[in-house]
């Protein structure tokens, strides 16, 4: 049975991935600076800071993993300087050092982010970056470190897109809660289509990348998403129906939403961490979002385990009973 270390295993994707790999028969070890909310994962958990290199190396040597999935990172947008994201820069250097100190590792998957490019921007290639946030800049540094380092295993980079599902938090849990409660307001007359990813499909894709032949994934970058764009207004209607509600969605002209978003920006300046709408979120909301998924389809295949309706039902059930 093959052994996997998941850094950031107490995060949203990390917990779902750990549960999936355990179910698939892997020997899973997870590490994070925080304890997993999912109590089933406590026996598999070790609290380790990515910035504590000696502890990290000792942990890797103790486990002797066949695979490493590096999800650990600071992911919020609240940092004031790039130094605030040291977990994404020094942290990845330490993970690489830990991998290189452990001869057992056959393959490593490193998580980056779609925010290495601004929303709506289509990069020319995997080395074309255009971040607009400090978090995005930190993930550009993450990728550059990986691509220029000597790593004693096959490796690839994943860029999760808009991933949602059980155990999620800001921003997509906020979106679901707003839609469910009737507070979500869609821009009137604006059609927005985006690639989202249900986390059940995302962990399926990650495991397929993990076991793929090395030449198919080594030194490549893969976006993580479901394959068909979803109309955001129709998604909001489906979310309401998954909770047994009417599919009515309130809509307002874009100019009014801009005023509300500016109010949210001001609230954030004065210390409110999570206002309902900001200019950044509005820009995200109204921007079509598509990515080149051809390379991951070539490795994983086109068939994913969850349809949109299945995914919504599973997420609604989790929110009602556990979330």
Label each PLM-derived region with a short phrase.
Residues 291-323:
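Amphipathic terminal alpha-helices
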Residues 132-156:
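Active-site Tyr-X1-5-Lys
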Residues 93-134, 156:
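Conserved Rossmann-fold NAD(P)-dependent oxidoreductase catalytic core, especially the SDR/UDP-sugar
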Residues 199, 260-303:
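Conserved C-terminal active-site "lid" loop/helix of NAD(P)H-dependent oxidoreductases
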Residues 212-276, 309, 313-316:
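Mid/C-terminal beta-alpha module of Rossmann-like enzyme folds, strongest
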């Amino acid at each position: 049975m093959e052994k996997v270390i998941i850094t950031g295993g107490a995060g949203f994707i990390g917990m779902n991935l750990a549960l999936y790999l355990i179910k698939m028969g892997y020997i899973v070890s997870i590490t994070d600076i925080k304890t997993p909310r999912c109590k089933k994962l406590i026996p598999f958990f070790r609290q380790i800071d990515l910035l504590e290199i000696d502890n990290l190396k000792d942990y890797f040597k103790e486990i002797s993993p066949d695979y490493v999935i590096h999800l650990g990172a600071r992911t919020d947008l609240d940092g004031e300087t790039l130094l605030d994201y040291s977990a994404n820069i020094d942290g990845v250097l330490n993970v690489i050092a830990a991998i290189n100190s452990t001869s057992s590792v056959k393959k490593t998957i490193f998580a980056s982010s779609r925010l290495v490019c601004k929303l709506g921007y289509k990069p020319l290639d995997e080395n074309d970056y255009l971040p607009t946030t400090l978090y995005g800049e930190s993930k550009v540094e993450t990728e550059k470190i990986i691509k220029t380092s000597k790593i004693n295993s096959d490796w690839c980079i994943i860029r999760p897109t808009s991933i949602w599902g059980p155990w999620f938090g800001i921003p997509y849990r906020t979106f679901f809660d707003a839609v469910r409660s009737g507070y979500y307001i869609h821009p009137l007359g604006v059609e927005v289509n985006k690639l989202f990813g249900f986390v059940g499909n995302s962990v399926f894709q990650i495991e397929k990348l993990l076991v793929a032949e090395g030449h198919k994934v080594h030194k490549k970058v893969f976006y993580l998403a479901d394959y068909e764009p979803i109309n955001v207004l129709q998604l909001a209607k489906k979310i309401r129906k998954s909770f047994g509600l009417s599919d009515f969605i309130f809509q307002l002209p874009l100019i009014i939403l801009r005023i509300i978003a500016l109010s949210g920006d001001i609230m954030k300046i004065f210390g409110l961490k999570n206002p309902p709408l900001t200019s950044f979120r509005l820009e995200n909301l109204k921007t079509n979002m598509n990515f080149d998924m051809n390379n991951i389809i070539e490795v994983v295949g086109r068939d994913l385990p969850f349809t949109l309706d299945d995914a919504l039902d599973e997420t609604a059930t989790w929110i009602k009973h556990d979330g």
